[in-house]
Amino acid sequence: MVKDTLFSTPIAKLGDFIFDENVAEVFPDMIQRSVPGYSNIITAIGMLAERFVTADSNVYDLGCSRGAATLSARRNIHQPNVKIIGIDNSQPMVERCRQHIAAYHSEIPVEILCNDIRHVEIKNASMVILNFTLQFLPPEDRVALLTKIYEGLNPNGVLVLSEKFRFEDTKIDHLLIDLHHQFKRANGYSELEVSQKRTALENVMRTDSIKTHKVRLKNVGFSQVELWFQCFNFGSMIAVK
């Protein structure tokens, strides 16, 4: 695993964070050291796939990055005629994802596409994964995407939505942000790295509250919506059609 040192030296002109070649190269290390509970979420996606994925259906991993969630789901699917479609708009991520998936043999076909998830049809789905993806979409596009997902899910299908959250109580919000930064420092990131990455993400990652997520998912039509995992200001929800 290549170590993430992208923000370890001062950057004179710090632009917006993008999922380019450099990020794709170090992404597994970056996300493990940056997202509290990430491994637990990936493992549980497999457990949810085992329960929810049905025969003759599709599984979508929207914003699949290097394929961790896709592989976790695939390892735990025991139904016939299932196909997994992973989609990411970063070509470097897609190339590495394809290599990663190909390294593990399975009877379940996986197709990895380089595309904008807003422009991809969702159909005959028993499971859709949005693992730290929605937060990078413009807020005005989120309802349309979730509506498309809901309409493309079969009855009793599940959406797994993992996100970084903001909290309406300012003191709690600041506390959890501080704890997250402490988590990153404990994982070897310097103050400079934490600060520069936060600045780079400011304009591209817009977080919502748990309440906002729940209300939006209910309004789209999901019958059951629940937060099943949280660590500091990161967490994951399930929404069942």
Curated annotation (Swiss-Prot):
Task: Name the InterPro entries on file.
Answer: CmoA, Methyltransf_25, SAM-dependent_MTases_sf
> Which keywords are on file for this protein?
S-adenosyl-L-methionine, Transferase
Q: Which GO terms describe its molecular function?
A: carboxyl- or carbamoyltransferase activity; S-adenosyl-L-methionine binding
Record flagged with keyword Transmembrane helix: no
Q: Where is the signal peptide?
A: none
Q: Which Pfam families match?
A: Methyltransf_25
- Cross-referenced Gene3D superfamilies: Vaccinia Virus protein VP39
Kindly list the positions annotated as binding S-adenosyl-L-methionine: Y38, G63, C64, S65, D88, N89, D116, I117, N131, R198
The alphabetized list of GO BP terms reads: tRNA wobble uridine modification
CDD domains, from UniProt? AdoMet_MTases
Is Transferase one of the keywords UniProt gives this record? yes
* Catalytic activity field: prephenate + S-adenosyl-L-methionine = carboxy-S-adenosyl-L-methionine + 3-phenylpyruvate + H2O
Q: What is its EC number?
A: 2.1.3.-
- What interactions and quaternary structure are annotated? Homodimer.
Function (record text): Catalyzes the conversion of S-adenosyl-L-methionine (SAM) to carboxy-S-adenosyl-L-methionine (Cx-SAM).
- Please report which protein family the annotation says this sequence is part of: Belongs to the class I-like SAM-binding methyltransferase superfamily. Cx-SAM synthase family.
Listed name of the protein: Carboxy-S-adenosyl-L-methionine synthase
Q: Which organism is it from?
A: Haemophilus influenzae (strain PittGG)
The gene from which this protein is expressed is cmoA
